[in-house]
Amino acid sequence: MKPARVRIALTVLSILVAFVAFAVWFMTAMPGTRHRGPLQPLGVGDRQLLANLKAHVVAVASEEHNVGRPEALERSARYIEATLSGLGYAVSRQEFETEGVKVRNLEVRRTGPGAGKARLVVIGAHYDSAQGAVGADDNGSGVAALLELARLLKSVQPAEGLEMRLVFYVNEELPWFATEKMGSLVHANGLALGEREVVAMLSLETIGWYSDAPGSQRYPFPFNLLYPSTGDFIGFVANPRSRSLLHRVIGSFRRHAAFPSEGAVGLESITGVSWSDQWAYWNFGWPAVMVTDTAPFRYPHYHTLRDTPDKLDYDRLARVVLGLESVVRDLVIAAPSN
């Protein structure tokens, strides 16, 4: 090969190597340090949290509950409403119809001082199950976590100009995902029509199953080349536009929670990256992060009738909730930067 061609080939190779290195850094570099080592016992005061999480999952996800099973879906919705009302919240309904069934999103708010339209920090979880599934992990775990966050955060005072919204969505699962009947898309569209600004959104999606067994964790390409093979962590996933929020969220979680965590930035075309309610907010250009145990990439009972309340690890779920409580407090005390 001629010297000129060698130089060109080396230059091209150097550019490719630099591009790959940058892409890996962009996707995987996260603030803080991942917790390693044994978990400390939960405190005495945290036992109530653990018991509440179990009770919530049993109440909302002991049977298939979706538009195809409207009575069960209604029971889950009423439990959520009753629990929030019992905590002293005024529960707002966003009602619409799906195949002749009246369904609803449920929302509670805490608003900081100041005039004008507050910027929004939205924490959400869907409460419907997939067809043919009980839905304890997907997504009774997310609903239980959000109900407990409502309890833990009921006295929070958002900063001036900020409003915290806790939202329970219907119709996240197929066949409604990414359609006009998807609950979170209905919610996000309503905010856009009202000219509201979402500065941060967290989607709590399937967060209750963990394993210490080597090989228990799988990933879509290219994450399988970059992340650990043991499913003992909680994951935080964002699209490139939400990278700044992801760093803020996982940095806060790692400061406050002695629990393993991993973060990833991925294109929405990568399998699984957009598989939850954060997708609805991405559609409007708002920063949003999915919090997940990675669902089908770890959980053997995903979308089956075996996804029952007895399968979940409530001790570890409680630790995740405590970490998320601190994350949300950090988000609503000061305005998140986009």
What is the role of each PLM region?
Residues 10-28:
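Hydrophobic membrane-insertion alpha-helices, especially the h-region
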Residues 107, 121-124, 165-168, 199-205, ...:
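Structural recognition of the beta-strand scaffold that forms the well-ordered cores
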Residues 44, 56-113, 262-264:
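A non-catalytic alpha/beta surface segment that caps or lines the substrate-entry region
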